[in-house]
């Protein structure tokens, strides 16, 4: 492969390696970051890491009704969905600029396009 006009292949390779390193560091930071999701006006709260690991679930005792378990289940699902949206948004913000036009590291999905 021939370098572009005035281009230096070793400099291009070094730049690509540096970008990949920055992307991997950002992915690691994202995996360790925590987001808080909630539903029912804060009656059910969850804490989820960027990696998807659920760290905590907090349920207000007023929502616990043995005769209406479905409502509590819906609130937990809603809080998880809220946290999932926040993780996606955070990934777009942190990885989008780094991954734009640059392939993701092997085994990693490409970053979502901004505005998706």
From Swiss-Prot:
Compartments, record wording: Cytoplasm, Nucleoid
InterPro entries from the UniProt entry: YbaB-like_sf, YbaB/EbfC
Coiled coil start-end: none
Region (Disordered) residue spans: 97-116
Pfam families linked to this entry: YbaB_DNA_bd
Family: Belongs to the YbaB/EbfC family.
PANTHER family reported for this sequence: NUCLEOID-ASSOCIATED PROTEIN YBAB
HAMAP family listed in its UniProt record: DNA_YbaB_EbfC
Subunit structure: Homodimer.
Protein name from the UniProt record: Nucleoid-associated protein MAP_0317c
Gene source species: Mycolicibacterium paratuberculosis (strain ATCC BAA-968 / K-10) (Mycobacterium paratuberculosis)
